[in-house]
């Protein structure tokens, strides 16, 4: 398509979606449902045959039913969100990332014959004002920073490939507040999401976030004051509570980032905790299985097979219509069946640390590419990233998706074959040392995972970025 025509079409589509969003925001609860249903039709224009007619109809019925859990959740979020924040997020995350971006990404995967991610994760800084037990982030050291120009390059080049969602981690990203706000203002058509320990969120910062509208937050919290502060330090829980109050008061979208361990798994998933999060204003959250990454890791924090099975059952219950808690939890390790297994290596995301090293995953600290020397596209063609591209899925049981945690022999093989180096500049960890910590875990988890998987409905979603295998092929149990 001619570039000028494409640009005009883009502007017209964005304006049309913007009008629909304005209608949704101007009505309350039940009156919104008709327009929300029309957004399903917009999605169909972009996704086409990627989903079945039944899937589109199910989505339409669910979102237009005022009594469905998901309608109630959407209304709950919209009612407490500042209009500018809600509108900007709907356009940037909804239209640009989900609709238009996904279409562009799929085209580019075919064009460039490599993984093209849906989101890019990067660390503005390695500096952090905390030192949590078992955390790998501190092992990068505290002197590395991506310059504003580095971050601008990441977003600019990512957008050219269709990437309109950027997540910021660290270290503590808000050590770089000023540059983050500057970046969000320059790239006002993308959505930013920040993983933060909450301690640097204050009133002036919240006002700027509302003005810009394109920043959301994931706050680190781990259950009760006792379970949280035992790992994150005394006073951290109180800081999170204060940040939640500020964000809710200003109508800023935020969720939670929860690392579940052997010690806190019930505390971070029980009904009381989930309802408490909703009352504080959080209605979605990411759950992360503790990973034994780094020389200072604490492998004893990894959940038992029984605990992991509990987690799978619990998260699925919390998302079901049977549960009346308006909260949408997502489990990075256990939701593989919905995304076709491992999403790292650029398949759906990758990570750039504060030294510029491009890593397949935030938990895989090995690389042979750097944003200072290479473009995003060159990174995606680098040896380690292509090893991911050619090797995914790493296991046809998507409850055993990771080449480190559940298939440690595969990560060792890829690192050795590609010559990737450790990116932990302060305390480099050999891939043998890392994977040795996962061997017993993987062996112990396999029987339980295989038993669950044998009764799991196979998702027939389109995973066109797998090189050789498609979900329509027979799946080994």
Q: What does each of the following model-derived ranges do?
A:
Residues 134, 138-141, 348, 367, ...:
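Secreted/processed peptides and extracellular or luminal domains of membrane proteins
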Residues 120, 346-348:
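Short loop/turn microsegments at loop-to-beta-strand junctions
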Residues 1-61, 229-345, 353-355, 359, ...:
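Radical SAM enzyme [4Fe-4S]-AdoMet core and its adjacent flexible, acidic
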């Amino acid at each position: 398509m001619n570039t000028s025509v494409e640009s005009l079409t883009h502007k017209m589509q964005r304006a049309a979606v913007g009008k629909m969003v304005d209608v949704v925001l101007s009505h309350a609860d039940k009156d919104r449902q008709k327009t929300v249903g029309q957004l399903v039709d917009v999605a169909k224009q972009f996704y086409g045959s990627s989903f079945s007619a039944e899937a589109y109809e199910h989505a339409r019925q669910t979102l237009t039913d005022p009594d469905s859990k998901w309608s109630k959740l959407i209304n709950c979020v919209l009612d407490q969100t500042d209009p500018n924040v809600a509108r900007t997020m709907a356009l940037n995350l909804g239209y640009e990332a989900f609709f238009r971006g996904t279409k562009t990404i799929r085209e580019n995967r075919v064009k460039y014959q490599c993984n093209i991610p849906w989101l890019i994760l990067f660390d503005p800084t390695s500096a952090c004002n905390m030192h949590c037990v078992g955390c790998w982030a501190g092992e990068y050291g505290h002197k590395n920073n991506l310059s504003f120009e580095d971050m601008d390059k990441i977003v600019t080049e990512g957008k050219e490939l269709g990437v309109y969602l950027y997540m910021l981690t660290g270290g503590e990203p808000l050590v770089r507040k000023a540059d983050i706000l500057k970046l969000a203002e320059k790239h006002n058509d993308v959505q930013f999401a920040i993983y933060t320990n909450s301690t640097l969120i204050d009133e002036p910062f919240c006002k700027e976030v509302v003005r810009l509208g394109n920043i959301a937050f994931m706050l680190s919290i781990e259950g009760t004051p006792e379970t949280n502060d035992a790992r994150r330090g005394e006073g951290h829980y109180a800081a999170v509570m204060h940040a939640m109050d500020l964000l809710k008061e200003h109508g800023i979208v935020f969720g939670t980032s929860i690392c579940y361990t052997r010690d806190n798994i019930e505390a971070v998933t029980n009904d009381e905790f989930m309802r408490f999060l909703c009352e504080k204003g959080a209605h979605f959250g990411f759950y992360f299985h503790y990973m034994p990454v780094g020389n200072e890791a604490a492998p004893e924090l990894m959940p038992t097979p029984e605990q992991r099975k509990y987690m799978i059952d619990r998260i699925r219950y919390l998302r079901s219509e049977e549960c009346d808690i308006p909260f949408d939890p997502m489990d990075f390790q256990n939701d593989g069946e919905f995304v076709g297994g491992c999403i790292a290596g650029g398949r759906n995301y990758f990570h750039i640390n504060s030294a510029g090293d491009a890593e397949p995953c935030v938990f895989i600290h090995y690389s042979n590419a750097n944003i200072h020397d290479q473009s995003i596209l060159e990174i995606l063609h680098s040896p380690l990233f292509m090893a991911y591209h050619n090797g995914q899925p790493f296991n046809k049981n998507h409850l055993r998706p990771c080449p480190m945690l559940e298939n440690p022999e595969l990560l060792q093989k890829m690192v050795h074959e590609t010559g990737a180096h450790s990116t932990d500049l302060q305390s480099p960890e050999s891939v043998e040392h890392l994977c040795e910590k996962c061997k017993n875990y993987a062996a112990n988890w396999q029987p339980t995972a295989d038993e669950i998987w044998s009764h799991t409905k196979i998702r027939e979603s389109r995973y066109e970025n797998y090189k050789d295998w498609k979900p329509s092929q027979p799946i080994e149990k």
